[in-house]
């Protein structure tokens, strides 16, 4: 029985990283195990905590009553089944011992290492554009969240056990922390890096003040401060290189790599396209009207070449094609509009692309293809939904969020209409779907179990919860099967260890 639970949890961990189907199998096994397991522990548990944990799923059930699209409501209910099954499972099974916990943790970290290695190999050694394509198993944002969780847990473990831990154990943990942080940088995961800056550093410093000598704490502060300084300096340097003109002021144009695009005069633009067309035919044997296909978008090679010339600081003339290197020609042939994108510095590439997204939005109002600008557009249009018909109290219902969001986008003639995108803010999603009542239920669902079980004293749980809550500001963390299963498993695992009604207490910090 003990090993069956280890198998189920390890299977769920593998599914989180590698496969939605495996996650579904793990969830089915959890439901079956709950039916078959001895219910003595379940009967003795704190029912108020369990009911609070089931409140969010109950919200989806209740929301079906005022949902217009019942088919979508049933899909949402099915997707959110982990909020029902996972807590019941963890509250019923026997508590895993230390050996089982080690086996589960070992497998979970091994899965992260394997998946991250595959992603980096695909990203750097194969023709893969970005981490979204390099990580074929699921959402790269959710994977970054998993990596940040593992990084924080390893750091907290070192700080809480530094007196008892062997040098080998500390060395392994530090090595894994360095590897996971390196993965986030090499994969240019801005979300993961920001989560580390906002959550990892403050929580770790707080734990260090409680657990470690002042000398080691001071050293940790120095390391963290140096990391923040380096990151801030890099972003500032990139911004200076990108936005500060290198050849005079840039009036009525957009700037890239310090050079100005003059895009207002169509006569000049047509003349420059003609010059680019000559070079495309002569040097790359590409027809002037050829298009480069990137996913769902198509771009004219003349525009790609024109932008590349500007980024190099070259005048857009046929004669200047001779000044391009073979690698420059290959970049244009491969649809790369900026030489920085082929520099091999993933963090710099991601930041420069973000800069271009803002410039394109400022100059042309271009939204599609820009992740950050898209989110702002979705937040603006999504917030309008609750203003109609007094929906601020109960929301639109379990199954109507996607439909109502698309309707709002169409009414404002947004470029994101019919894109199928969601809000990308979990709090706003809950408010639109279930209104103010739903937000209050969600707060109860998050706060009450942690308060009742005193897990706010547990550094592991505080870090996990802070990480998830911060990620919800820019992502629908709980609107994706990976995110839902991850939250349910971690939250239920921690809470289920403090649910005994007698005076015996199980502290995760001492067992992990």
Name these PLM-found stretches.
Residues 1-38, 51, 56-67, 79:
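N-terminal signal-anchor transmembrane segment
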Residues 2-6, 42-56, 100-108, 168-173, ...:
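Membrane-interfacial loop-to-transmembrane alpha-helix junctions, especially the N-terminal start
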Residues 12, 58-61, 65, 99-129, ...:
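Alpha-helical transmembrane segments of multi-pass inner-membrane proteins
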Residues 18-37, 77-89, 142-151, 194-201, ...:
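Membrane-embedded alpha-helical segments of multi-pass membrane proteins
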Residues 29-34, 196, 200-201, 445, ...:
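Transmembrane alpha-helices of multi-pass inner-membrane enzymes
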Residues 49-56, 70-94, 103-107, 112-116, ...:
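Aromatic-anchored transmembrane helix interface
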Residues 300-312, 316-321, 346-355, 359-434:
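Long extracytoplasmic/lumenal interhelical loops at the membrane interface
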Residues 433-466:
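Hydrophobic transmembrane alpha-helices and their immediate junctions
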